[in-house]
Curated annotation (Swiss-Prot):
Organism field: Cupriavidus pinatubonensis (strain JMP 134 / LMG 1197) (Cupriavidus necator (strain JMP 134))
Highest taxon, organism lineage: Bacteria
The reaction(s) this protein catalyses: uridine(2552) in 23S rRNA + S-adenosyl-L-methionine = 2'-O-methyluridine(2552) in 23S rRNA + S-adenosyl-L-homocysteine + H(+)
Any Pfam family: FtsJ
Alphabetic keyword roster: Cytoplasm, Methyltransferase, rRNA processing, S-adenosyl-L-methionine, Transferase
Binding site for S-adenosyl-L-methionine: 64, 66, 93, 109, 138
UniProt gene name: rlmE
Protein's name in the database: Ribosomal RNA large subunit methyltransferase E
Main location: cytoplasm
EC id: 2.1.1.166
Assigned protein family: Belongs to the class I-like SAM-binding methyltransferase superfamily. RNA methyltransferase RlmE family.
Classification lineage: Bacteria, Pseudomonadati, Pseudomonadota, Betaproteobacteria, Burkholderiales
């Protein structure tokens, strides 16, 4: 009984925080599907990630707020015409996602060969045969509460993003991934350092203080022998 009361109290507390969250209110007002858009916005404003003419891939895109922000930023370019983005955003997720204007969405698991091939074809068409400028990954596993298992799952998703970036990024491209502070965090950072010349942690204000969520940014691929 006490456990049920505790869980109900937690749910009520979360709901209260969510309703009164300024980023939730801002997302509703500005038409973003999730408050996560402001995490990317803050990092982008700090690091100037999204530039006119870029090809951007959003891994684990659903519900779509990162794709929305990237698309809007490209559409705000002085070179953009008719409200269309100057560049391209390609989003992929295992989960379904409501369409985002001017964003190409692929539903599927990019670890599967046919889905990966489809993603490559879409990217090649968008980039004119060139490589990608920016890879975004807000992917997160279903957490079990078992620290060792959760760390392994988080590291695995980061590895997937790193492998994808290594193959498809331009030499001066960038990769931004979500991860969590925990037992595997330092290993993820080391993997980034082996692959990128510049590596930086980011904890935007829109990321809740209570959360161990953080982001790692890698820029400028190292030459892999």
């Amino acid at each position: 009984m006490a456990k049920g009361k505790s869980k109900n109290k937690f749910n009520q507390s979360w709901l209260h925080d969510h309703i009164n969250d300024p980023y939730v209110k801002m997302a509703q007002r500005e038409g973003y599907r999730a408050r996560a858009a402001y995490k990317l916005k803050e990092i982008d404003e700090q690091d100037k990630l999204i530039q006119p003419g870029q090809v951007i891939v959003d891994l684990g895109a659903a519900p779509g707020s990162w794709s929305q922000y990237a698309r809007n930023k490209l559409a705000a370019s002085p070179r953009a015409t008719g409200g269309k983005p100057d560049g391209a955003v390609v989003a992929i997720d295992i989960l379904p996602m409501e369409p985002v204007a001017d964003v190409t969405f692929i539903q599927g698991d990019f670890r599967e060969e046919d889905v990966f091939r489809q993603l490559e074809e879409v990217v090649m068409a968008a980039s004119g045969g060139a490589k990608i400028d920016l890879v975004l990954s807000d992917m997160a596993p279903n957490l079990s509460g078992v620290a060792s298992a959760d760390s392994a799952r988080i590291e695995y998703l980061c590895d997937l993003a790193l492998d994808f970036a290594q193959t498809h990024l331009k030499p001066d491209g960038a990769l931004l991934v979500k991860c969590f502070h925990g037992s595997g965090y330092s290993q993820i950072v080391e993997k980034f350092k082996r692959q990128f010349k510049v590596v930086a942690p980011r904890k935007p204000k829109a990321s809740r203080d209570k959360s161990s969520e953080t982001f790692i940014l890698g820029r400028y691929l190292k030459v892999v022998n």
